[in-house]
């Protein structure tokens, strides 16, 4: 093929390795809660350094609070779950943004893994960009016809494909 696109998400490092290329990934687990009532009409976002539960987003008849961020091992990425501790953290931090969350029913809890490109100076992963990363391996590694696209958030994966394929 004249061009191979590695869009393997959190498994992208393994695909790149098959081509003799090193892509250091940072598997960042994130959890969020969906509530059964829309309690805000605009996005509420804390003006602070990135942290857990710093955004409350309205949508139709619901709202969501999120997210958490923690590094997980590659052996855990296929089976991430929202923990009771994460629920407690999201609730306690979310109630600081909107006290009404204390009495709003949780409909669902979601967890996923962000396929972030690792940064040497950020072992926590909190300051790694959540933006889309396009690695041209001809420029970067001398391997023509091979690119890796990764990063982003679970909710933007379709935008990634639309913008770069």
Label for each model-derived stretch:
Residues 1-3, 7:
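Core beta-strand elements of the Rossmann-like FAD/NAD(P) dinucleotide-binding domain
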């Amino acid at each position: 093929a004249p061009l191979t696109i590695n869009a393997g998400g959190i498994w992208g490092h393994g695909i790149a390795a098959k081509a003799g290329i090193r892509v250091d990934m940072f598997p960042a687990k994130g959890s969020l809660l969906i509530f059964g009532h829309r309690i805000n009409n605009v996005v509420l976002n804390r003006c602070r350094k990135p942290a857990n539960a710093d955004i409350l987003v309205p949508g139709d008849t619901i709202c969501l609070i999120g997210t958490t961020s923690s590094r997980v091992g590659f052996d855990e990425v296929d089976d991430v779950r929202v923990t009771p501790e994460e629920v407690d953290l999201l609730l306690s931090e979310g109630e600081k943004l909107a006290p009404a969350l204390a009495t709003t029913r949780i409909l669902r809890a979601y967890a996923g893994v962000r396929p972030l490109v690792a940064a040497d100076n950020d072992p926590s992963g909190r300051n790694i960009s959540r933006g889309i990363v396009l690695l041209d391996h001809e420029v970067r590694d001398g391997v023509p016809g091979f690119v890796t696209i990764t990063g982003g958030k679970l909710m933007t994966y379709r935008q990634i494909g639309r913008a770069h394929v």
